[in-house]
Amino acid sequence: MNNRGAVTDMISQLPEPLILQILGSLPTKVAITTSVLSKQWQSHWKMMPKLEFDSFLRRLDLENVTKCLLSHKAPVLQTFSLKVRLDRRNNAVDIGCLIGIAMTRNVRKLVLEVYFHRGTFTFPRSLYHCETLETLELILNVVMDVPPSVYLKSLKTLYLLAVDFKDDESVINLLSGCPNLQDLVMRRNSSSNVKTFTIAVPSLQRLAIHNGSGTPQHCGYTINTPSLKYLKLEGSKAFESFMVENVSELIEVNITDVSEIIDEKLRVFLTSVTRLSLALSPSVFTFPTGIIFNQLVYLEICTNKTSWWKLLPLMLHSSPKLQVLKLIDDTDGMNYVEASGEWNQPKNVPECLHHLEKFIWEGYKWKREEIEVAKYILKNTNRLKRAIFSLKGISSEDRLVVVEDLKSVVMATTNSCQFQFI
């Protein structure tokens, strides 16, 4: 027996669940080729819980993918992922057949990335009536025409990335047919047939909406999600038409690169959240005047936005019950552009600093305005328990100076804060 045969024989003695785990760590096309090792190995790949095919990496014949799906014998197909560009060789009918076969294999998660530039794309009816599908990820350069009779009772997670719909009704048809949907992630493309994206899902708990820079400004949103706990809004001025009807359970909000929030109801709901993350530039974003975040205990502000230090005092004064403040800059030192301007400390110390318990600065770069902000906060807190600074962007020679400089501020007060530098 040669060395390859000996290794193959040793692997064959492993428990089948472990063999399937090993095969699952390989690209699907590679795992399938193990069937030539021996007669015993001809069936192992057919029990794999995950099948992934990517024509972007290598030319893919959908006929071969169909044969693989038809040969699959596992009682449940946990994941079926297909990335394909439709052309003369691979057409929409082939995609429809593959989806239909996957549904008969009790697929739990379907990931479909399709690029198609000619007209609408009609999915097989089986996609809209699958009882086992729990996660659906659609990355489509296509137009979806969704029928009114949709029922995906097990679907809990839905990604719609660069997906366009035939009209407003197609959106309503899809979402109304998902009675147990909990997570929805949307990334709108630059050309949209949908004027108002209606999200009326009573079960929805997490919603993320990203508008690209090319998203038409006439595109609006209507949100009615009474169970929603997390909301993320990202992108340009496209949120000018944004209507919130019911988000009474909202706890956490993340807002990134949004110029203005017009809807008064959303402003009201923002005042009831306990966690808020902002990546905004005050020079672009219109801060709502007179708003008080009475329930806010956790605030995160991104420090790589222009004039971010002007937003900070506004939020501190508006958040009287704040307990945790996190400032974050996830850009590396090579991409850092020092903003012009200076920190003007508030005339009156914000009430929240008197009972702030935790101060985190991730990506502290020891810039002038950062030093002023850090010292102001450390100096004016008297209940601060922990201060955590990430100094990865600072040279090892300067770190000791930075540490001593920050600690000296607290030593001059009655604060018994514990420092952590990482």
Curated annotation (Swiss-Prot):
Span of domain FBD: 342-391
LRR-type repeats, residues: 132-153, 154-175, 180-201
PROSITE patterns named among the record's database cross-references: FBOX (PS50181)
Name of the protein in its database record: Putative FBD-associated F-box protein At1g55030
Location of the F-box domain: 8-60
Record keyword Protein biosynthesis present: no
Highest taxon above the source species: Eukaryota
Gene3D superfamilies on file: Ribonuclease Inhibitor
Pfam families listed in its UniProt record: F-box, FBD, LRR_At5g56370
Upper classification of the organism: Eukaryota, Viridiplantae, Streptophyta, Embryophyta, Tracheophyta
Keywords noted in UniProt: Leucine-rich repeat, Repeat
